[in-house]
Structures are given as C-alpha cells and as structure tokens.
C-alpha cells in the first residue's frame, strides 16, 4: 500500500469522507468547517485541538500528493476542499460503500471491533449484521495489492478482536493489543451514545456552515 498519512492527514481525510456522505449539501468543506470537523469531541479518537494553520499545512501536503483538491469557485474568498483519497477516475484505490465507511471510521477512531464499527458507520454504510462487517474487514485485510487493515490479537476476556487501518504505516500489534478498551457490552453502548451526539453535532455544523456561506 503506497499511501501513508500522518495522524493529522488521516484526520483530515477521514473528516472529508465523513462529511461528503453525511452532509453533502455542505461539501466540499471550507478550512473553518474542516477544522471544526477535525476537532469534534464526538466520534473522534483521539480528540484533537488543531489550529486552522495545522489543518491547512496538512491540506497543502495532501494537495501536493493529489489526495485532496481545492474546489473553490472562481474569485471565491473561501477555499473549499474535497478528498481524492479513493474512487477517483485515475486513482488506484477503489472502495465499495461498505469498505469506504469502515476506512473512514478507522481514520477517525483508530482500532475498533466489528461491533463498534457496525454501530459507528450507520450513517456511512449499511451492514445487516456484525458478520457482514467481519467479511468486509477480512477482504480489506487480504487485498492483493497489499492489506489496508490488520486484525489485532484478541485480548484476554474480550469477545471480539479489534482491527486497525494501515494508512499511517505498519501497526505495532503488540503495543496496540496492550491498550485495553472498554468491555464489549459497555463499549457498544458508549458507541451508540457517541453516535447520537455525533448526529446532533452534524446538524449544528451544518447550520454553522450555512451561516458561514451566507457571510462569505
């Protein structure tokens, strides 16, 4: 796999993919909207406190690598950005809706179990059950051109193994396995509550973007 991102670049790409699906009327995103999305307290792990300068540096680096494009209208005072991370006409990375939803969720949240992924991707893709999530994860982990995700060793007492994307380089499996997440049942409930908060945040961000567009 050729694409390797920094943590901030991964956050930026994840946010652009997320907003493309969940708030298409507000996409592409302005720098302000992208910074707000990157710093969301819901549906983000870890929570970041990035400045617009931090985000712009990441965006500029991604534009140079043709992973993001500036879609600003002629003479517009506000730049608008969209991702070119996957499913572009000449790009190598082609993802299904389910694969794209999973990768987006991992770029925003890091390592997660199939159950957590199913709950957290409910606005990005449709999965009928956890087994369907597991099947897509296994496909992503065995891509012919190189794995896109890796399955982490299952921790003692846990029902599910976590999976992690490989877009930020190789994963230290032993270190990741040592990180102890919440128990299976509580983590799923927490994920559901986080998703509800995320949806409210989406509505608020959409309103902010509308106000911003009126003022620009």
From Swiss-Prot:
Family under the similarity heading: Belongs to the UPF0502 family.
Protein name: UPF0502 protein VPA1223
The species this protein was found in: Vibrio parahaemolyticus serotype O3:K6 (strain RIMD 2210633)
Lineage: Bacteria, Pseudomonadati, Pseudomonadota, Gammaproteobacteria, Vibrionales
């Amino acid at each position: 796999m050729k694409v390797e991102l920094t943590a901030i670049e991964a956050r930026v790409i994840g946010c652009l993919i997320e907003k493309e699906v969940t708030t298409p009327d507000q996409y592409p995103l302005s720098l302000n909207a992208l910074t707000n999305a990157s710093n969301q307290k819901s549906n983000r792990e870890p929570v970041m406190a990035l400045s617009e300068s931090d985000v712009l540096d990441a965006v500029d680096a991604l534009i140079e690598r043709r992973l993001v494009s500036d879609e600003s209208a002629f003479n517009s005072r506000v730049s608008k950005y969209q991702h070119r991370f996957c499913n572009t006409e000449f790009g190598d990375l082609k993802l299904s809706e389910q694969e794209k939803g999973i990768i987006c969720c991992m770029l925003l949240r890091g390592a997660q179990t199939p159950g957590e992924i199913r709950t957290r991707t409910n606005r990005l893709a449709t999965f009928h059950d956890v087994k369907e999530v597991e099947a897509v994860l296994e496909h992503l982990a065995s891509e012919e051109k190189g794995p896109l995700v890796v399955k982490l060793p299952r921790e003692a007492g846990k029902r599910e193994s976590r999976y992690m994307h490989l877009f930020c380089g190789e994963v230290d499996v032993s270190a990741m396995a040592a990180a102890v997440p919440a128990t299976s049942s509580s983590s799923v409930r927490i994920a559901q509550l986080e998703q509800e908060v995320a949806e409210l945040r989406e509505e608020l961000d959409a309103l902010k973007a509308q106000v911003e567009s009126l003022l620009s």
